[in-house]
């Protein structure tokens, strides 16, 4: 089992540790609800070093990635990042990822922890058609720290005073130094709040983590585990691989059409997406439940005539709204905000309501 460079800090902080994606990771510290609320009201510090990361370099690196992903990388300038998906030829999702453009020949990819080996193999399988392009896995060399919340930018400013964070917009990044260590700081995140994600060599991770934590103490900063990371993303309706998206779900079903650019030229899965677009019958929607039960993945969803129309993708008790919420993959004609549905939780049907996503408003608006 792998450990991140911050593992011993988590252990000393009393975190509950679990196996996630082959890493020993903190699932919670003080508790999921308290950590969630800290991010929504102040700031949270996340160790997400288990995420996979690759460098793609070479003269034809952009052409290679344009073929591998759904979004249009030609629209991305140096110092910008873009949300993307890799698809199988049938339109199912290999993974979702963020691509950072350092320059025209250098791209940095962050992928889901559970898919790192699969993604590397998928990219490597197709790279041969693009002469001179090189793929390198740096997952074991680099740490990734996320600082998220309404006061996150105020905190990071004190640790990196030379960086003009006011000029750094969402999905932009800069490169600087922390001591002698090269650092990449991106205005990205998985919570819906203002914040940054910071990538740096493993040996510099602990000093930076402690500096950010100390700088945020007066603001109410909290370390945050994977448990609250999931409730935060679910309140925003963000997709998680293996839940809202997977190898059998087309991104058009999953509310991700905005990240699929049919007119950019050829990419793997394009023809399948075009066919799905013509005959789109299902979609992912948000829902809430009236009773205090927790809807879980694979619970069946029914219409008011008690006909099965789909299944739950993700579910939780929203710490912000204090009610059970979730996402479901259902027949499209039932995706109307305010419509009633029924969710089967442990053999009992519970009345719910289709909800507009995201469930909450945040510091990003």
Curated annotation (Swiss-Prot):
Coiled coil: none annotated. The keyword Transferase applies. Its EC number is 2.1.2.10. GO terms for biological process: glycine decarboxylation via glycine cleavage system. GO terms for cellular component: cytosol; glycine cleavage complex. It is an enzyme of class 2 (transferase). One of its GO terms (molecular function) is transaminase activity. InterPro entries: GCS_T, GCS_T_bac, GCST_C, GCV_T_N, GcvT/YgfZ/DmdA, GcvT/YgfZ_C, TrmE/GcvT_dom1. Pfam families: GCV_T (PF01571), GCV_T_C (PF08669). It catalyses: N(6)-[(R)-S(8)-aminomethyldihydrolipoyl]-L-lysyl-[protein] + (6S)-5,6,7,8-tetrahydrofolate = N(6)-[(R)-dihydrolipoyl]-L-lysyl-[protein] + (6R)-5,10-methylene-5,6,7,8-tetrahydrofolate + NH4(+). Keywords: Aminotransferase, Transferase. It comes from the Bacteria. The keyword Metal-binding does not apply. The glycine cleavage system is composed of four proteins: P, T, L and H. The glycine cleavage system catalyzes the degradation of glycine. Belongs to the GcvT family. This is Aminomethyltransferase. It comes from Chlorobium phaeobacteroides (strain DSM 266 / SMG 266 / 2430). The gene is gcvT.
């Amino acid at each position: 089992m792998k450990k991140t460079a911050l593992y011993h800090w988590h252990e000393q902080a009393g975190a509950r540790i679990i196996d996630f994606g082959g890493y020993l990771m903190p699932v919670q510290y003080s508790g999921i609800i308290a950590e969630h609320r800290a991010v929504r009201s102040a700031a949270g510090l996340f160790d997400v070093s288990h995420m996979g990361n690759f460098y793609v370099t070479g003269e034809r690196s952009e052409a290679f990635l344009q073929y591998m992903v759904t979004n249009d990388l030609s629209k991305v300038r140096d110092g910008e990042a873009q949300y993307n998906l890799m698809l199988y030829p049938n339109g199912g999702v290999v993974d979702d990822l963020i691509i950072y453009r350092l320059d025209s020949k250098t791209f940095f990819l962050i992928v889901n922890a559970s898919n790192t080996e699969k993604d590397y193999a998928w990219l490597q399988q197709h790279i041969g058609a693009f002469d001179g392009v090189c793929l390198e896995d740096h997952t074991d060399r680099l740490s990734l720290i996320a600082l998220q919340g309404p006061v996150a930018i105020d905190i990071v400013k004190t640790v990196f005073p030379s960086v003009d964070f006011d000029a750094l917009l969402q999905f932009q990044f800069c490169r600087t130094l922390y001591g002698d260590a090269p650092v990449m700081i991106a205005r990205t995140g998985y919570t819906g709040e203002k914040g940054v994600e910071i990538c740096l060599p493993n040996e510099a991770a602990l000093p930076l983590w402690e500096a950010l934590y100390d700088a945020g103490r007066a603001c109410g900063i909290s370390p945050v585990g994977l448990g609250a990371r999931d409730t935060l993303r679910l309140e925003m309706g963000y997709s998680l691989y293996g839940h809202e998206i997977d190898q059998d779900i087309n991104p058009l079903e999953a509310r991700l059409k905005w990240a699929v650019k049919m007119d950019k030229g050829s990419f793997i899965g394009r023809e399948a997406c075009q066919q799905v677009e013509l005959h789109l019958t299902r979609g992912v929607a948000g829902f809430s439940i009236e009773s205090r039960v927790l809807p879980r993945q694979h619970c069946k969803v029914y219409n008011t005539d008690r006909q099965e129309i789909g299944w739950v993708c993700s579910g939780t008790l929203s710490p912000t709204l204090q009610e059970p919420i979730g996402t479901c993959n259902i027949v499209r004609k039932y995706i109307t905000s305010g419509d009633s549905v029924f969710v089967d939780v442990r053999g009992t049907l519970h009345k719910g309501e289709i909800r507009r996503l995201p469930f909450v408003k945040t510091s990003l608006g």
